[in-house]
Amino acid sequence: MSDQPADKSANKPDLAAMRRDYTLAALDESAVARDPFTQFECWLDEAINGGCAEPNAMSLATVDGSGAAARPSARIVLLKGVEAGGEAGGLVFFTNYESRKGRELAANPHAALLFYWIEMEREVRIEGRVEKIDAAESDAYYATRPVKARLGAWASPQSQAISSREWLERRMMDADARYGASPPRPPEWGGYRLIPASFEFWQGRADRLHDRIAYARGAQAWMIRRLAP
């Protein structure tokens, strides 16, 4: 019997061969809404009603500064509001202002969002400037969260290194003992609004000839164009 370890590579999936064809729908610039917020809300509704898993989940990309030395980072957050129309219309999410993303947004307020609805063979990319929402708006949303989630906002010094899971659980118990069923909103926790400068709607198509329709904010109206896949 050989003493050589078994070759596990034979059981590994062939990543280079993994692919799927996209055939569910098409996207034409003559048929999209003139306002990208309208188009986005239409697709979001279809993702919700179409059974997509966590349709409001989005990747948020930020950078820690500007210039060649800036480093990007990304994570999944949840969309909690769409404020359509006007110069200040935007997409709202909540987090800890002292987390890595919060610190990066303080250093550079430009960010990108990505929604990927694989069940619909669709993707939406949104880029723009991020600002904090009013404290009253953050208070109102925070009050709707489950009590444990509100206590967790007090317990977790998000993005900081901690000694153990037990340390975090003790912090949770301390927050529960202090605030009980009525924890106030921590001052370092609240909402942001991304004000879009551009949208891109991607619809998967056969043979990798995907449809890409981009919107860019103009002086008077949104400009619409098709991009090569």
Language model features: what each stretch is:
Residues 1-229:
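Binding-site signature for planar aromatic cofactors or substrates
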